[in-house]
Amino acid sequence: MQEKEKIIVFSSREICYQSSSFFANQMADAFEKLGFDVSVCEFDEQDDLDAVFQPLYGKKYRLLLDFNSTITRMVEEDGTPVLDKIDGPFFDYILDHPLFHYNCLNANLKNLNGIFLDEAQEAYVKRYYPRVKQTLTMPLGATEAVTGGRKKETEEILFMGTYDDPDSIYEMVSLSPEPLKTYMKELIDMRVEDPVLPMETGFRQLLKAHGEELPDDKFALFMNAMYPVDAFIRDYFRKAAVDELVSAKIPVRLVGEGWEKYESCNEAYVTREKPVVFGLSFEKIAHADVLLNVSPFFNHGAHDRIFAGMANRCTVLTDRNPYLERILKEGEQVCMYSLKDIRTLSDYAAELLSNRPLCREIQNNAYTEFKHKYTW
């Protein structure tokens, strides 16, 4: 009998709402169903790393996978990267903009590869991180709620995600040294004006307008230093979206970290709930009718929240971008509004909440598409 090929799925750091562990175990289950011998290896940097890695050295694996990995920076006492002592291609599944992972993606490994959630971000890594050998854009899968969902036909929109006060982030930008401060403020203006403009494209345009050039390695370093731009854009548009709904007297239920910092123009239409671990988020989505997505940091890609809604028969109301317009049918599988014309959000939300047959039709279409393409 032929021996099964081996795969290790790591979880080397906990990402928000304990999602790294959840993703690792979902991926492992999916690989096992395909006939692989799969191990899940969860640890953090406080663990005995010798005990974690020594048993793996010299062994052959079809795939080594991690999420926003810390392993790429780990070395033995003689300077040898631990991943170079394991025989197999390593893929780092990057779950936010690669600019946050400058050191990890620059690691001098024999077989470093990357998976991304956004096509423009994949192209960015191809150009600016030559040590990454193979790249792939692939959305995360989604999971159906364990208990199943009984829809509550309430007049509210559910949003699940994190928030920070954009003014506080902008203050951080204002305190930055030059030329970073000027670059970041101009980039913020550009991305507010054009929400589907990739940050790296905007930075190249900005440099050209200033008559300046940067070599590729310095360009990536500057991008890493300008991380507050991406953080600001996320929260600027999340605030704008919730403000728009509340102004239109459409109730919003906010579940996640940081929403106590949100100041509403009409608190009567805002409900805040404590965050839940990632695995329980599907239960809340399964009992909701309409799920809001605001993810301008993946403006040529797809946030997993979209597929979570589709998997749990919850109508997804998402900011549009070219990638989503290509892979999903607007008005049939999801509903797309424009961040540039935020009034389209409240118009669409009001239509969905007043037309339950349309909601059900979209939910059923979306669930069929999820089962066909977006399971783990």
Language model feature labels by segment:
Residues M1-D87, M223-P228, F232-Y236, S247, ...:
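N-terminal pre-catalytic "stem/leader" segment of glycosyltransferase-like enzymes
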